[in-house]
Amino acid sequence: MSELVKISKTQFENVFQCEFNDGTVRLCTKNLAPGFSVYGERLFKVEGVEYREWNAFRSKLGGAILKGLKQNPIVKGTKVLYLGAASGTTPSHVSDIVELEGKVYGVEFSPRVVREFLLVAQHRPNLFPILADARFPQYYRTLVEDVDVLYVDIAQPDETDIAIYNAKFFLKNGGYMMMAIKARSIDVTKEPTEIYEMEVNKLKENNFDVIQVIQLDPYDKDHAMVLAKYKGK
């Protein structure tokens, strides 16, 4: 197995680069819950600090960073609403990035998956699992404060509409949305690039300035990450 030889900072706060003796380079984050691995990722201790390897093939945010994300609005102290938290793989890295000064509210619809997410959250005081349907934000509005970033990863045909609706409830004016679009969940008959353009236009029509659209191949086939800034309700 390859051994870690160097950890260095990236352009993004609290996102690091791990270099190994076989020449490979991976992303990593400081582990907010030392000793605990979330999805089988490797842990490394350097000068008393534990880091977690961040597998971009398991995380669309990790893939977007490696594919040239220009700006990561998720930093120390950020409050994030995460729709489609699943079992907590990417939310756990977001939890590392925002540290204890930030908060990550993770909405997931599947009770079975939420049980796994709860096991992750019990070691992370800044991670708040919510069992709910993201189509109905009014049911969790009392649980979530206004947030700086809305992160959306729900493989539904109406994902963009759900994202916009949640933004109206929770996203601060001037806040950011990061949305992972799965083209095949929206329309299997159209080319992915055509679908990305359609969904981006919906955002523009609903008070978002679209900053960047990143195709996530090879990390996620027929997926794109959209970064947009919210101009307000």
Curated annotation (Swiss-Prot):
One of its GO terms (biological process) is tRNA processing. GO terms for molecular function: histone H2AQ104 methyltransferase activity; RNA binding; rRNA methyltransferase activity. S-adenosyl-L-methionine binds at T89, T90, E108, F109, D133, A134, D153, I154, A155, Q156. The keyword Transferase applies. Keywords: Methyltransferase, RNA-binding, rRNA processing, Transferase, tRNA processing. Signal peptide: none annotated. Its EC number is 2.1.1.-. It is an enzyme of class 2 (transferase). Involved in pre-rRNA and tRNA processing. Utilizes the methyl donor S-adenosyl-L-methionine to catalyze the site-specific 2'-hydroxyl methylation of ribose moieties in rRNA and tRNA. Site specificity is provided by a guide RNA that base pairs with the substrate. Methylation occurs at a characteristic distance from the sequence involved in base pairing with the guide RNA. Belongs to the methyltransferase superfamily. Fibrillarin family. Interacts with nop5. Component of box C/D small ribonucleoprotein (sRNP) particles that contain rpl7ae, FlpA and nop5, plus a guide RNA. This is Fibrillarin-like rRNA/tRNA 2'-O-methyltransferase. It comes from Sulfurisphaera tokodaii (strain DSM 16993 / JCM 10545 / NBRC 100140 / 7). The lineage of its organism: Archaea, Thermoproteota, Thermoprotei, Sulfolobales, Sulfolobaceae.
